[in-house]
């Protein structure tokens, strides 16, 4: 089973003037100057830092990952003073495997930059490029055999439905890290299993699917 611990409290933020303050996430340093409608809000690099204890896990059968759901716009992540990853793009999730890098007590530092650079587009627009860690940060413990976490921050699962002649075919493609048997179950709104398939490229078929029909029949 997967366990997730949020790292939202007890962060130290070092701003553009070099001063440090305690903050909780989500946080942006443009909360005030980014609201006045002008384009003179501060853009550059600031730093976030927090401490956490290593989670309990079995190194033989489990892995530990850090997950960032949104850091705008570029991020460099350091664990115990060592750079472990960098990410460009403020609107996408990214993760990093840290099992072998953990100590008993750990210091996580994130250098965040919302300045103009040639790696992220658009570089200028009629909206504010808020700088900061504005979505959740999590510590995840997962089995070694798991749905992929390191594939560009996505879920590791692609679902493609096709409807023809009142029947439905659903393709479920899953990226898997490790070994194991992958099973897919499709449930109806009442929790009943209506279709099953096995494998990383599973195909499900429904003879009489109950379709969603807007306000007339909003079935999900």
Which residue ranges define each predicted feature?
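Secreted/periplasmic carbohydrate-active enzymes, especially glycoside hydrolases
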Residues: 1-220
């Amino acid at each position: 089973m997967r366990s997730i611990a949020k790292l939202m409290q007890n962060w130290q933020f070092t701003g553009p003037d070099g001063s440090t303050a305690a903050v909780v996430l989500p946080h942006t340093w443009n909360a005030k100057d980014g609201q006045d409608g002008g384009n003179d809000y501060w853009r550059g690099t600031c730093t976030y830092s927090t401490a956490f204890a290593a989670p309990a896990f079995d190194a033989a059968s489990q892995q530990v990952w850090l997950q960032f759901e949104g850091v705008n716009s570029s991020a460099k992540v350091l664990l115990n003073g060592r750079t472990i990853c960098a990410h460009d793009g403020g609107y996408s999730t990214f993760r990093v495997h840290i099992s072998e890098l953990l100590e008993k007590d750990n210091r996580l530092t994130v250098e965040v930059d919302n300045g103009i650079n040639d790696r992220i587009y658009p570089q200028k627009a009629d909206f504010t490029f808020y700088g900061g860690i504005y979505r959740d940060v999590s510590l995840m413990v997962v089995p070694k055999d798991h749905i992929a976490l390191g594939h560009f921050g996505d879920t590791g699962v692609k679902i493609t439905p096709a409807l023809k002649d009142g029947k439905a075919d659903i393709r479920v493609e899953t990226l898997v890290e490790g070994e194991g048997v992958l099973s897919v179950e499709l449930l109806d709104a009442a929790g009943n299993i209506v279709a099953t398939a096995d494998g990383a490229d599973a195909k499900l078929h429904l003879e009489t699917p109950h379709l969603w029909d807007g306000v007339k029949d909003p079935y999900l």
